Structures are given as structure tokens and as C-alpha cells.
UniProtKB/Swiss-Prot annotation:
The keyword Disulfide bond does not apply. It comes from Buchnera aphidicola subsp. Acyrthosiphon pisum (strain APS). Belongs to the complex I subunit 4L family. The gene is nuoK. This is NADH-quinone oxidoreductase subunit K. The chain crosses the membrane at residues 4-24, 28-48, 60-80.
Length: 100
């Protein structure tokens, strides 16, 4: 069984990896993937803490996190598909320019 420290440390590394990628990347698809990595890191932390305290609350919260991530990803991918069809790019710097 994984210890509390190792599980939370792995979760922290995943969260920092997702946050760094969120800040550095300029492609909206990679930003969405970074958000998914961050949500999975939070879910891992919930499961590790729940397992450490022998409570099922962490696993129940993780089900909610998975549900939130799935709905967020499906809506965001549908919006990205429409955005790409209209603008032919997913670069956030180009999309943020105002056209007048």
C-alpha cells in the first residue's frame, strides 16, 4: 500500500506539471489537457487521503471529480471543434485578437 506522503507527493507533482503546462502552452487543446491532469491530481489526493483515514469519502468525491471532468471535457471539445472550424486555429494568442 502506498504511504500518505508518497501519494500526496505524487499528486503534488502531477498538479504542478498540469499547472506549468497550463501557464506555458498557447494551444487551447493542451490547456484542456492540462486542466484534466490537474483534476486527476486532485482526485488522486482525495483517494490517498481517504484510504489513509479508512474512509470512503475520498472515493465518493473522486466519482464527482470524474463526472465533472467528463462533462467539462465533452463541452470544451465540442466548443473547440466549432472554434477550429470557424477560425482554423487553436492558438490562444491569435484568437484573443479583436477583429473590427
Amino acid at each position: 500500500m502506498i504511504s500518505l506522503f508518497h501519494g500526496l507527493f505524487l499528486s503534488l507533482i502531477l498538479f504542478i506539471l498540469g499547472l506549468t503546462s497550463l501557464i506555458v502552452r498557447r494551444n487551447i487543446l493542451f490547456i484542456l489537457i492540462s486542466l484534466e491532469i490537474m483534476m486527476n491530481a486532485v482526485g488522486l489526493a482525495l483517494i490517498v487521503v481517504g484510504s489513509y483515514w479508512h474512509q470512503a469519502d475520498g472515493q465518493i468525491m473522486y466519482i464527482f471529480v470524474i463526472t465533472l471532468a467528463a462533462s467539462e471535457a465533452s463541452i470544451a471539445l465540442a466548443l473547440l471543434l466549432q472554434l477550429y472550424r470557424r477560425k482554423k486555429t487553436l492558438n490562444i494568442d491569435i484568437l484573443s485578437e479583436m477583429n473590427g
